[in-house]
Amino acid sequence: KYKRVQDNNNVLSPQKINLKDIVAISAATGVNSNLDKDDEKLDLLNDNTSGGHTLALDKNGNVWAWGLNNKGQIGTNTDVKFEQIQLGFTTNGYTNDEGVVEGDSEWHKEYDAETYYTYIPSQENLYITEPTKVVGLEGIGYLNSISEISAGGNSSIAVRNDGYAYAWGNNDNGQLGDGLSDNASMPMQLLSGTKNPYVTYFRDALYVDMATDHAVITTRDGEVYSWGANRNGQLGNGATSVKETSPVQV
């Protein structure tokens, strides 16, 4: 019943999304849409907010995503390309022929013979304006048998019925929990971390919440694990560190 980002314009009133049998949704910053459970097309039971993209879970366990895809958070196994443009330097900022270009964490500048350049995301694959099925591991098939979803910042995570978890998107702070810090445009399986050093992947996950720079998961036994940025002790493991790239117990 409510529309997030399916065109290039802001939407000031609720609009239907072309999806059926949805049981959960996790939406981007600025959206708090409690959808009507009796709606003939959408059957949404809960929603929460994150940052720039939207996840939806249907009754068959498939995950759908749309919106901003600058970090691969839509999970389509497609990367956003960057284009180089030349900028003139002024005391007020960097400008090109079209005017001032504001800074962004995605942009980088180089100095070469008194010429400044910046790299900006191209429009190709940057915005996914229609609900798109999230691909499976290694880009094969699609995620399935999913019971929980959460979108946070520019990252996404899902829990499968068998207790395994998968994350994709921004990984600057290790919030995908795959032991790395590289962004991923397709799901990466969550490592076991300190839960069980004798197995590779996390098992028995029940609920999950992806924040802007870290994530938290609860198990069927009531244990809580977290991973990602920890400069402010947000992982709750009794320590502070730059980041943890796999789960640690709270």
Which residues does each PLM region occupy?
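Eukaryote-biased RCC1-like beta-propeller repeat architecture
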Residues: K1-V250
